[in-house]
Regions:
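Glycine- and aromatic-enriched mobile tails/lids
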Residues: 2-3, 34-36, 42-43, 47, ...
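N-terminal Rossmann-like FAD-binding beta1-loop-alpha1 element of flavoenzymes
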Residues: 4-29
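Conserved N-terminal glycine-rich FAD pyrophosphate-binding loop of Rossmann-like flavoproteins
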Residues: 33-66
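Helix-loop-beta segment of a Rossmann-like dinucleotide-binding subdomain
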Residues: 73-77, 108-134, 197-201, 297-307
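Short beta-strand to alpha-helix junction loop
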Residues: 75-85, 123-139, 203-211, 236-240, ...
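Conserved redox-cofactor binding core of oxidoreductases
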Residues: 95-180, 185, 192, 233-240
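Glycine-rich loop(s) and the adjacent beta-strand/alpha-helix scaffold that form part
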Residues: 188-243, 377-393
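An anion/pyrophosphate-binding glycine-rich loop and adjacent beta-alpha core
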Residues: 216, 222-329, 393-399
Length: 544
């Protein structure tokens, strides 16, 4: 029986787990927290698909074209085609396992418009689609747990891959309760560790997603891809702790963006520039337009009747009332762009295998399907679909040889123990917050050469000092040992952004304002002993 180690228990990790278990493989599903606390539960808007009986005259080909166009043609057509062709079956599967979709007046799954799409094709569960899918998949995981095919390991954090000569044989995980490292050997390891929110501090996402796994595997030889493409969601609301996402569903239901001019009159700037559908341009376009107004921007949905708002946007109503005392049935929502999604991550082939054999990546930590900008509604689809693709690929592989890494485990445990006996030079939180400030200031919606160089120099200072920074014993050891990997990833993101001398999708350069034909390829970056090597994937080495 094949053994599969999946690290991360959000939607992509659970999708891969139930698909592997369904094919008779034994799965260890490891994560720091239960699935109910994964970032996946925060996904509000919906999941894209073209169903056979749709009344929109929509087609799978239209979904493919919209996805490729929305990604500024950097996503691979073959992988996107597989994603879109499989979407209808995924909606049916999710219904079958208990996902409670909102229904239209004919009792069928309801769908609405989302940005950058030529037809209404985003199916939803109110404004809590992620929660519903997590709940349904969680029940499937429990079913396979009862059958002995899935074993959950909670309180486990990724430490490093067990990699030799470009092949992965397992991973070392850190136990939060034991403060010990443990080696897990497997025929395949699947990373489902999410995006890079900690790099930027206040984002719409969870700080569980810190990018460390990608940074550490990058240091261990994995190729990363498209790191410069960072999606700023155009409609987020400021709160004390973070930026709260105001779902694209609000604009899908007719929400209008505006600012006030000198006469205190509303200017519907998106409609003025792009016509009636202006509010539903792609996220990169809307964020850039908000940035260029230089004004306070508002999103208004108050013209809809209260019954419709309560039925279709209940979570948005409750969110605004709870955190800002705003009644969206009566007044507009103050919004601004904020870091939301990372199109870049571990480079994977169409079967989700990384540059390291037997190491796979799914969900937001994998760079596939979205190109230079993700369409709303495609991330949940990619999470469910990608987990299945990886499971299929793993099932076709022969069981690999076993190599033990006992000396490596012992050495890493000794390093951890010795570090715990030191006294902190700087508080972990101080360094983390400073890194986030550097990234926010130098990797905004619009970037320029000087700011990118400044950011690289500041991150380099911390990287060079990493060996002298002692552990902060006021936090979990995980936060201490993960810091160097996060710093290396931050430097790689800045390096890729400086390398791409054009404006495409979510990447905008002040000095290079147009799309350049010479950059019509994904960015690949490798790491070797402190050296960062960037190139364009002109040969279609990954995602075709």
């Amino acid at each position: 029986m094949k053994n599969v180690l999946i690290i991360g228990s959000g939607i992509s990790g659970m999708s891969c787990a139930v698909n592997c278990a369904g094919k008779g493989m034994h799965v260890i599903l490891a994560s720091p927290f239960p699935s109910e606390r994964a970032q996946s539960v925060m996904a509000a808007g919906g999941i894209n698909a073209v169903l056979e009986d749709n009344e929109e005259d929509d087609t799978v080909e239209s979904h493919i074209k919209d996805t490729l166009k929305g990604g500024a043609y950097l996503a691979g057509e073959e992988s996107v085609r597989g994603l879109c062709e499989g979407a209808g079956k995924i909606i049916k599967y999710l219904e079958d396992i208990g996902t409670v979709f909102s229904l239209d007046d004919k009792g069928r799954p309801a769908h609405r418009a989302f940005g950058g799409q030529s037809h209404k094709r985003t199916y939803y569960c109110g404004a809590s689609t992620g929660k519903q899918i997590v709940t349904a998949l969680n029940m499937e995981v429990r079913r396979f747990e009862a059958a002995g095919l899935i074993e959950r390991r909670l309180g486990m954090c990724f430490h490093s891959g067990l990699i030799k000569d470009g092949v992965c044989y397992g991973a070392i995980l850190y136990g939060e309760s034991t403060n010990k490292l443990e080696a897990f050997y497997a025929d395949a390891v699947v990373m489902a560790t999410g995006g890079q929110n900690v790099l930027f501090g206040k984002t719409t996402g969870s700080t569980q997603c810190d990018g460390y796994a990608a940074g550490k595997l990058f240091e261990q030889g994995a190729v990363l891809k498209n790191l410069e493409f960072i999606q700023y969601h155009p409609t987020t609301m400021e709160t004390a702790q973070k930026r709260m996402l105001i779902s694209e569903a609000v604009r899908g239901e007719g929400g209008r963006l505006f600012y006030l001019d000198e006469k205190n009159e509303r200017v519907y700037f998106m409609e003025n520039k792009y016509g009636p559908e202006g509010n539903l341009q792609t996220r990169d376009v809307v964020s850039r337009e908000i940035y260029e107004t230089g004004k306070d921007v508002y999103l208004d949905i108050s013209f809809l009747d209260r019954k419709t708002i309560f039925a279709r946007l209940p979570e948005v109503y409750e969110l605004c009332l709870k955190y800002r005392n705003i009644d969206i049935t009566r007044e507009p929502i103050p919004v601004a762009p904020s870091v939301h999604f990372f199109m870049g991550g571990l480079a994977v082939k169409n079967d989700h295998e990384t540059s390291i054999r037997n190491l796979y990546a799914v969900g937001e930590c994998a760079s596939i399907y979205h190109g230079a900008n993700r369409l709303g509604g495609n991330s949940l689809l990619a999470a469910v679909y990608g987990g299945g693709v990886a499971a299929d690929a793993i099932s076709r592989r022969e069981e690999g040889e076993k190599i033990l890494f006992e000396d490596v485990l012992k050495k890493e445990q000794e390093k951890l123990t010795q570090a715990a006996d030191t006294e902190s030079t700087f508080a972990y939180a101080h360094i983390r917050d400073d890194v986030a400030k550097i990234m926010q200031e130098n990797l905004g919606i619009v970037r320029d050469e000087k700011s990118l160089i400044d950011g690289m120099e500041q991150i380099d200072f911390y990287i060079k000092s990493a060996g002298q920074i002692k552990y902060d014993n006021s936090v979990l050891q995980y936060f201490n040992y993960s810091l160097p990997g996060i710093l290396i990833l931050a430097r790689a993101v800045l390096t890729c952004a400086r390398f791409r001398k054009e404006s495409r999708g979510s990447h905008n350069r002040k000095e290079f304002t147009e799309i350049e034909a010479g950059f019509s390829y994904p960015t690949l970056i490798s790491y070797d002993n402190g050296n960062y090597s960037v190139r364009l994937d002109k040969e279609g080495e990954y995602e075709s």
